[in-house]
Amino acid sequence: MAIPMRPRLLAALAPTFLGFLLLQVAVGAGTPPGKAFNLTWISTDFKTILEWQPKPTNYTYTVQISDRSRNWKYKCTGTTDTECDLTDEIVKDVNWTYEARVLSVPWRNSTHGKETLFGTHGEEPPFTNARKFLPYRDTKIGQPVIQKYEQGGTKLKVTVKDSFTLVRKNGTFLTLRQVFGNDLGYILTYRKDSSTGRKTNTTHTNEFLIDVEKGVSYCFFAQAVIFSRKTNHKSPESITKCTEQWKSVLGETLIIVGAVVFLVTVFIILLTISLCKRRKNRAGQKRKNTPSRLA
């Protein structure tokens, strides 16, 4: 005997409805719908944040990071954010490889409101591991700043500022140079102001001294580089700076012209005074040589 259409439809939809019902019951009981994903380290000059997805519903996140003893340390416990600042942990030793993971911890409704069910019945909450993070190798270098520059004759001198990091020693923040030593260098890319052709110069210090053409303006920018790295070895480009040799040449020209005008003016004044004195002397001599008339 054929089954009527409506009971057949209900029979087909029953598993779907049951699954949906169980999902709602699980969520209501505090079971997290899933684990964190897209775990990403965001780190510049050792300022380090771990980010992930998605935004939690009916559960919270807790981050764990391994210390040098291989023990898990809890950070950002019971947070509903999707990021956690781990800077204070990773700057303790920038040459250590850190492991981190994000745990999804469900809520539980109680007489005290919502509470987190952490490690219920001895079971560990679902978690997702982040990739291993070695600060010395993985932190990005921030945009450098050109501190000062000077072009004189055929030489251009450029000094790059030695930026501070969040790494501390004896309570004092260390500079990039103090952390990386000779592994840190800078690349200067420069060109004539009126040209598109570029040249580069590399230094292991913070200063450049390059040969240029006299009286020609130059534009340039700097990049930090970590020589031992295969990836993330260059920083973003600094703000481009340009010398203004036309102003320098104009200034020198004005000084020369001004000096010439001053000397000419002084000469004219002295000549005028001298001529006036001569005229007076001649007039006086004339009066002496002219015989006086008798009354």
Curated annotation (Swiss-Prot):
Membrane topology note = Single-pass type I membrane protein
Q: Where is this motif: WKS motif?
A: 246-248
The residues on the Cytoplasmic side of the membrane are: 276-295
Q: Where in the cell is it found?
A: Membrane
Q: Which GO terms describe its cellular component?
A: cell surface; extracellular space; plasma membrane; serine-type peptidase complex
GO biological process: what's one of them? response to estradiol
User: Signal peptide: which range, if any?
Assistant: 1-28
Give the GO molecular function terms. Answer: cytokine receptor activity; phospholipid binding; protease binding
Q: Which residues cross the membrane?
A: 253-275
The UniProt keyword set, sorted, is: Blood coagulation, Disulfide bond, Glycoprotein, Hemostasis, Lipoprotein, Membrane, Palmitate, Signal, Transmembrane, Transmembrane helix
Disulfide topology: C76-C84, C219-C242
| Lipid-substituted positions (S-palmitoyl cysteine) | C276
Extracellular side: which ranges? 29-252
- Per the UniProt entry, the glycosylated residues are N38, N58, N95, N109, N170, N201
Q: What Pfam families does the record tag this protein with?
A: Interfer-bind, Tissue_fac
Assembly information from the UniProt record:
Interacts with HSPE; the interaction, inhibited by heparin, promotes the generation of activated factor X and activates coagulation in the presence of activated factor VII.
**What is the purpose of this protein?**
Initiates blood coagulation by forming a complex with circulating factor VII or VIIa. The [TF:VIIa] complex activates factors IX or X by specific limited proteolysis. TF plays a role in normal hemostasis by initiating the cell-surface assembly and propagation of the coagulation protease cascade.
Q: Which PANTHER family does this UniProt record tie to the protein?
A: INTERFERON/INTERLEUKIN RECEPTOR, TISSUE FACTOR
Family from the record: Belongs to the tissue factor family.
Q: What is this protein called?
A: Tissue factor
Organism of this sequence: Rattus norvegicus
